């Protein structure tokens, strides 16, 4: 109860907490490299497919996961048996996809001697996999491991919470855990005054940024083209290669967005156009202790500086990043001003806007290549995908810099991680 009162107290007065974040003194440059640093060696992702009608609609999640596992290992010429552990984030498969992920491991030529676990922390599952592998490296269990995320929203059942006690009816917070995500978006919009026009403008910007990035080839280095098969309308099977994200709509306009009806509530402001897309995809991130990476001659794409996950009220779960980001920044000894790029998952424009405004983040630092509204949101994949996108964009820019990955989490949480790009 005390925790809830603290969070609600933060929500009541945004200007004070926002200014406090901005007024904090800047960090004293970059930390010195340490042999014990947890570093990101490499990362790849599949294109993100449109669930139900895209190029991956007939592709099983183990095949998507195998594509990125294989690509990462081949890219850096790492022997599969060198992996100390694999962690795979997944939301919709039974048991967080534990069997599916182990199958993908074998399809990728990774031997049975390499262990694997599956993790489900809803929309942060891919980032939680990164944190889990980093934790194993830090505690000395192993020196190198693979963190992944995968989701086929086409082939998975959604909306079934499973076996739950009827006692939840007696507890408001327990009941709130079952509120549909679209209604939590409406709650955020209503409670904090996020207008339909602002949400649509945010969605338009996401589409425009993603379209520009796609046309310039900004995603080319991170995407693994996937050759697969699809069934056409006649039931015939044909082979295709999916090489770019399918949800990007360069023709999006404010006028078009304004015509869309509310998707979750009569008179509401959350629409299909200002919400994340239902998607299929996978991503993999190779992490190591710095000393092991150097010993094996592996590249260093980034350094994990901190990770934080926090709880917030379930009925406004989308505010999670507004509290997870400050927690992660504090652990890293940084402020909002020290960060070059914030990759904040766009579950809904309402909640993403709230978080950006709450923290006083300049718009140009937020999702510079577009976010989930344009690219899509394959639930278990997203956190790992964001890490890959963030570090590749920092690499493209070339200079030493910090970036943040963050997302809201269904049932009322937020997660965030701070990464350092070491510079070219």
From Swiss-Prot:
Signal peptide residue numbers: none
GO BP field: fatty acid beta-oxidation; fatty acid beta-oxidation using acyl-CoA oxidase; phenylacetate catabolic process
Induction of expression: Peroxisomal thiolase is markedly induced (at the level of transcription) by various hypolipidemic compounds in parallel with the other two enzymes of the peroxisomal beta-oxidation system.
Alphabetized InterPro entries for the sequence: Thiolase, Thiolase-like, Thiolase-like_sf_Thiolase, Thiolase_acyl_enz_int_AS, Thiolase_AS, Thiolase_C, Thiolase_CS, Thiolase_N
EC number: 2.3.1.155, 2.3.1.16, 2.3.1.9
Compartment annotation: Peroxisome
N6-acetyllysine: residues bearing it: 173, 234
Transit peptide location: 1-26
Active site per UniProt: 123, 408
Reaction(s) the record says it catalyses: an acyl-CoA + acetyl-CoA = a 3-oxoacyl-CoA + CoA; 2 acetyl-CoA = acetoacetyl-CoA + CoA; hexanoyl-CoA + acetyl-CoA = 3-oxooctanoyl-CoA + CoA; tetradecanoyl-CoA + acetyl-CoA = 3-oxohexadecanoyl-CoA + CoA
GO CC term (a single one): peroxisome
Keywords annotated in UniProt: Acetylation, Acyltransferase, Fatty acid metabolism, Lipid metabolism, Peroxisome, Transferase, Transit peptide
The family this protein is said to belong to: Belongs to the thiolase-like superfamily. Thiolase family.
Note: There exist at least 2 rat liver peroxisomal 3-ketoacyl-CoA thiolases.
Function noted in UniProt: Responsible for the thiolytic cleavage of straight chain 3-keto fatty acyl-CoAs (3-oxoacyl-CoAs). Plays an important role in fatty acid peroxisomal beta-oxidation. Catalyzes the cleavage of short, medium, long, and very long straight chain 3-oxoacyl-CoAs. Medium chain straight 3-oxoacyl-CoAs are preferred substrates.
NCBIfam families tied to this protein: AcCoA-C-Actrans
Record's subunit section: Homodimer. Interacts (via PTS2-type peroxisomal targeting signal region) with PEX7; leading to its translocation into peroxisomes.
Stated name of the protein: 3-ketoacyl-CoA thiolase B, peroxisomal
Source organism of this protein record: Rattus norvegicus
């Amino acid at each position: 109860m005390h925790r809830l009162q603290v969070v609600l107290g933060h929500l009541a007065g945004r200007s004070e907490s926002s200014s406090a974040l901005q007024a904090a003194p800047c960090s004293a440059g970059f930390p010195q490299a340490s042999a014990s640093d947890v570093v990101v060696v490499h990362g790849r992702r599949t294109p993100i497919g449109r669930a139900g009608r895209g190029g991956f609609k007939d592709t099983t999640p183990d095949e998507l996961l195998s594509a990125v596992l294989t690509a990462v290992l081949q890219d850096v010429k790492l022997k599969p048996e060198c992996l100390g552990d694999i962690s795979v984030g997944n939301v919709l498969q039974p048991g967080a996809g534990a069997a599916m992920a182990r199958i993908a491991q074998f399809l990728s030529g990774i031997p049975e001697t390499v262990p694997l676990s599956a993790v489900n922390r809803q929309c942060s599952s891919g980032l939680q996999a990164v944190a889990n592998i980093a934790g194993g490296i830090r505690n000395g269990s192993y020196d190198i491991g693979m963190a992944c995320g995968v989701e086929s929203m086409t082939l998975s059942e959604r909306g079934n919470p499973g076996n739950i006690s009827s006692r939840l009816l007696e507890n408001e917070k327990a009941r709130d855990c079952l509120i549909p995500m679209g209604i939590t978006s409406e709650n955020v919009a209503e409670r904090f005054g996020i207008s339909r026009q602002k949400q649509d403008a945010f969605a338009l910007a996401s589409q425009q940024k993603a379209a520009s990035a796609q046309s310039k080839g900004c995603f080319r280095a991170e995407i693994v083209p996937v050759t697969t098969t699809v069934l056409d309308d006649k039931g015939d099977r044909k082979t295709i290669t999916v090489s770019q994200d399918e949800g990007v709509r360069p023709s999006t306009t404010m006028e078009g967005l304004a015509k869309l009806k509310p998707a979750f509530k009569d008179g509401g402001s959350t629409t299909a156009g200002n919400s994340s897309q239902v998607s299929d995809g996978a991503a993999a991130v190779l992490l190591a202790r710095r000393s092991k990476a150097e010993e094996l001659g592996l590249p260093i794409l980034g350094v994990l500086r901190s990770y934080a996950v926090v709880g917030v009220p379930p009925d406004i779960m989308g505010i999670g990043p507004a509290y997870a980001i400050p927690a992660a920044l504090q652990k890293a000894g940084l402020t909002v001003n020290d960060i070059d790029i914030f990759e904040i998952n766009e579950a809904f424009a309402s909640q993403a806007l709230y978080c950006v405004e709450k923290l006083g983040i300049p718009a140009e630092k937020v999702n510079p290549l577009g976010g989930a509204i344009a690219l899509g949101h394959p639930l278990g994949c997203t956190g790992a995908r964001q890490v890959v996108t963030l570090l590749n964009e920092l690499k493209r820019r070339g200079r030493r810099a910090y970036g943040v990955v963050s997302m809201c989490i269904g049932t009322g949480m937020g997660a965030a991680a701070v990464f350092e790009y070491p510079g070219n």
